[in-house]
A protein has these predicted regions:
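Patatin-like phospholipase
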Residues: 1-37, 45-300
Length: 300
């Protein structure tokens, strides 16, 4: 029986995943397989290596200065700006609200593109160097936990799935960066002459990859209010979780936002594994005997 955890992409919302994963470790939840896309791939690699200290450290210190050199403020840029889901998610909005939202997102994107072209590309050197300091190929390869990621080949836009055994030695970090290369916010990654961009352009939540790797039971950490793969909800062998509230923009590295999301992920893990209860709020497990006795007295 192999148990997997699947981690979605979402940029700075990865703090939510970090909180979830740290809580899962506290609860002694064991996983034989970890798969992830984008920030989920980066968080997942640390879990596969057993480096929970590195995971916690990353989300304690991460801010915009640890991601880019001299980048504009992209706090409110939505992770679905470049997809039609922007329109789908706002079907309930009136036309003026929709226009305002699109105008705001366009303005943010234009601000970034000015920075991008002025500097001949986005300089994400701080983020790359931080990841390099954490990545240990031998530790990942020798781990009993199998690991896989999703990235996308460019310009074919074809999904590319890689397990750790399929990644060329010396390029494991490159594949992690490729999976999280949310172009054009992040530059493309080139590996052996092939260009790759963020796996979220194809599969932002690689559940099928976990199944292909032999998972019998799967825990899913989806960071979207609207599930990425609703077809997997309520499956007997899949525990599928989504956040109870919107986690904000995918480039929001404000400390308060990161701490909030990390706490939300932490509480979600405790609820998913049956230690806490609630949806919008969190409660200790209810004592059904107390409720039974109370209502019995009312009826007598």
């Amino acid at each position: 029986m192999k148990r997997a955890i699947v981690l979605s992409g979402g940029g700075s919302k990865g703090a939510y995943e970090a909180g979830f994963l740290l809580a899962a470790k506290e609860l002694n939840q064991h996983f034989d397989i970890v798969t992830g896309t984008s920030i989920g791939a980066l968080n997942g690699a640390l879990v596969a290596m057993g480096d929970y200290e590195g995971l916690e450290y990353t989300w304690n210190i991460l801010d915009m200065d640890h991601v880019f050199n001299n980048a504009p403020d992209l706090t409110d840029l939505k992770d679905d700006f470049m997809t039609t889901s922007l329109f789908n998610k706002e079907e309930g909005s009136n036309l003026s609200e929709l226009k305002e939202s699109i105008a705001q997102q366009t303005s943010l994107a234009q601000s970034f593109l000015k920075y991008y072209f002025k500097n001949k590309g986005a300089d994400n050197t701080p983020f790359v160097e931080h990841c390099r300091g954490l990545m240990d190929e031998e530790r990942l390869l020798s781990s009993p936990i199998d690991f896989g990621i999703c990235t996308v080949q460019f310009p074919s836009m074809k999904a590319c799935y890689k397990t750790k055994s399929e990644m060329e030695r010396g390029h494991m970090l490159d594949y992690l960066l490729a999976s999280s290369a949310c172009f054009p916010v992040f530059p493309m990654t080139e590996i052996n002459g092939n260009k790759y961009i963020d796996g979220g352009f194809s599969d932002n939540l690689p559940i099928d990859l976990a199944l292909d790797m032999g998972a019998d039971e799967i825990v899913v950490v989806d960071m979207h209010l609207i599930p990425v793969h609703p077809q997997y909800i309520n499956r007997p062998s899949i525990l599928y979780s989504c956040p109870p509230v919107d986690l904000g923009g995918f480039m929001d590295f404000n400390k308060d936002a990161l701490e909030r999301n990390k706490r939300l992920g932490y509480l979600m893990a405790y609820k998913l594994f049956g230690n806490y209860e609630g949806n919008q709020y969190t409660f200790l497990p209810s004592n059904q005997t107390v409720f039974h006795d109370y209502y019995k007295q009312l009826l007598m």
